[in-house]
Amino acid sequence: MDSSEMGPDSWMKIVHAIAEHYHDYDGFVVLHGTDTMAFTASALSFMLENLSKPVILTGSQLPIGMLRTDGKENLITAIEIAAARENDMPLVPEVCIFFENDLLRGNRTSKTNADNFNAFRSYNYPPLAHAGISIKYDIPQIYHPVSRKPLKPHYLLDRNIAILKIFPGISPQVVESILNIPGLKGVVMETFGSGNAPGYDWLLEMLKDAVERGIVIVNVTQCLAGSVEMHRYETGRKLLQAGVVSGYDSTTECAVAKLMFLFGHGMTPDEVKEHLNCSLIGEITIA
């Protein structure tokens, strides 16, 4: 399957396969196309609650049958990381992406290059490990579960989520068409800089109306690095007053997956907002 066709149904199959064989293996490697790998990694991080074993996603920019493929090294190292243990405990008990020598937290990662082997970056969180002659792990950065509870797989996701990308000259018709999608529950709004958008009266009114109708709007920055701080500028404060929720330093991929996960649990809009304001599995940084 081309990864462009991956989505919630595929994520559920992966979760089911891991849950079914969870006690048979020390770790898991998921081979995945690069285009939507960050979406899948983000979703799996929420869907595999109480995960205590490595789940490493990897793939290649060049098909593995080609002479210069990056796939062989990515696969071999991903397997080594998935099997790595210290004091009889997994070294990396979380969902990660391994690509071009770097191990990255899955829900912090985005695909940032379509042509180079270093296709993935995690700008707001440091790599968990770097592979050279040896693999050097940054242990303090690795997420470790607080307690050893049994794995709790989740299969319910709500797809009534949309992405609204703000751009100069955006029209009322564009915003209205998105905010009035039948059944819409959540919107990931990509804004400028530290969470800013034009202060158009019509835009603020549309956002406020959507929030009052129970639609959760989470604000993430279009920048590759940095965090949303809606208190910093007047334009951001107006979004806050309209009821828009901060996404902090979340990636768009993670924000989409998190909304699908939270609404999939039947949460009310207020409950979803409450969970957006906390880090569930190391996906955001809250100062």
Segments predicted by a language model, with ranges:
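ATP/NTP phosphate-donor binding region
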Residues: 1-19, 205
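Short beta-strand segments
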Residues: 30-32, 56-59, 93-100, 165, ...
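Short Gly/Thr/Asp-enriched flexible loops that form oxyanion-binding sites at enzyme active sites
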Residues: 30-53, 199-206
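Gly/Ser/Thr-rich loops at beta-strand to alpha-helix junctions
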Residues: 32-38, 103, 193-196, 225
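Internal gly/pro-rich beta-alpha loop/helix module
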Residues: 57-132
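Accessory alpha-helical/coil subdomains and C-terminal extensions
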Residues: 105-189, 194, 199-200, 279-287
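C-terminal non-catalytic interaction/assembly regions of soluble proteins
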Residues: 191-287
